[in-house]
Amino acid sequence: MALYITEECTYCGACEPECPTNAISAGSEIYVIDAASCNECAGFADSPACVAVCPAECIVQG
């Protein structure tokens, strides 16, 4: 199941460069995750890298 970013996103940009599948991009007001591209960092890390760096803790399970 893919992750998604909630409205609590502060648009800081910390998550985007952490994504190994380039599933995260800047939306109009918050960052967004492309569910078709997100694999929760399987094969790259033990847990989702974006979740680990998000200061607003707004990246959650979809």
From Swiss-Prot:
- Positions binding [4Fe-4S] cluster 2 in this chain are 19, 38, 41, 50
GO molecular function term, any single one? metal ion binding
What keywords appear on the UniProt entry? 4Fe-4S, Electron transport, Iron, Iron-sulfur, Metal-binding, Repeat, Transport
Q: Which cofactor does it need?
A: [4Fe-4S] cluster
Start and end of every 4Fe-4S ferredoxin-type domain? 2-28, 29-62
Q: Where does [4Fe-4S] cluster 1 bind?
A: 9, 12, 15, 54
What does the record note about the cofactor? Binds 2 [4Fe-4S] clusters.
The protein's matches in InterPro entries, at most eight in alphabetical order, are given as:
4Fe4S_Fe-S-bd, 4Fe4S_Fe_S_CS
- Role, per record: Ferredoxins are iron-sulfur proteins that transfer electrons in a wide variety of metabolic reactions.
Q: What is this protein called?
A: Ferredoxin-1
